[in-house]
């Protein structure tokens, strides 16, 4: 009988601890990101260390995009506004350029300004080789980025990625159509 009670207590403790490990996100992905240091829209170094201790939302865009990047960026702006309205602090937004040769810091600054981006917590990143962003996106965000040899349009995913304070991707959401803004805000709050 004592053995059975001890087993039940142990099981309950394991379940409780495993739930804590998910940081309040059900079925958290826990994809750990590798360190990075790139260049932001202000031509300053910006990297994972700058995001340490903060929850952040990432996406992959480029300024020359003819279709999906415009609505994605508009949706990220909506998310930034909603987070501010909800009084959420310690939240950052990161847009990785998938066309770094074209997307200089100046070009990214102009692009973000067209959407009234608040650059105090929204960082548009460049300053890496095309191959590097393609590999980083695949290895750590499990998404494709591919610039064809001909043409100027880059193939890339359209998801938003929620990253926790330790640099782990916890969840992803559509960033294009019918974006679940309320769910993302709820999940951001659950991580804080």
Language model: regions and residue ranges:
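C-terminal motif of bacterial Sec signal peptides marking the signal peptidase cleavage site
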Residues: 15-19
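Short active-site neighborhood of thiol/selenol oxidoreductases, capturing the structured segment around
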Residues: 48-70, 76
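Thiol-/selenol-based redox modules, centered on thioredoxin-like
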Residues: 148-192
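N-terminal "domain-start" segment that seeds a small globular fold
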Residues: 22-49, 74-75
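Short loop/turn microsegments at loop-to-beta-strand junctions
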Residues: 33-34, 55-56, 157-159
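Structural micro-motif
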Residues: 122, 134, 141-146, 155-161
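Bacterial N-terminal signal peptides that target proteins for export
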Residues: 1-9
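Structural microenvironment flanking redox-active thiols in thiol-disulfide oxidoreductases
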Residues: 74-136
């Amino acid at each position: 009988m004592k053995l059975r009670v001890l087993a039940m207590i142990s099981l309950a403790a394991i379940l409780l601890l495993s739930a804590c490990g998910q940081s309040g996100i059900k079925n958290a992905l826990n994809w750990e990101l590798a360190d990075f240091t790139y260049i932001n829209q202000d031509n300053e170094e910006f990297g994972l260390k700058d995001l340490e201790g903060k929850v952040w939302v990432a996406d992959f865009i480029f300024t020359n995009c003819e279709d999906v990047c415009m609505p994605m960026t508009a949706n990220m702006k909506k998310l930034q506004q909603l987070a501010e309205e909800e009084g959420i602090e310690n939240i950052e937004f990161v847009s990785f350029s998938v066309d770094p040769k074209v997307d200089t810091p100046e070009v990214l600054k102009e692009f973000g300004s067209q959407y009234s981006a608040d650059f105090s917590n929204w960082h548009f990143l460049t300053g890496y080789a095309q191959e590097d962003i393609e590999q980083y996106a695949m290895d750590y965000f499990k998404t494709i980025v591919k610039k064809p040899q001909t043409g100027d349009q880059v193939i890339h995913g359209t998801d938003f990625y929620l990253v926790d304070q330790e640099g782990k991707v916890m969840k992803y959401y559509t960033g294009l159509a019918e974006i679940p803004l309320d769910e993302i805000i709820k999940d951001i709050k659950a991580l804080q």
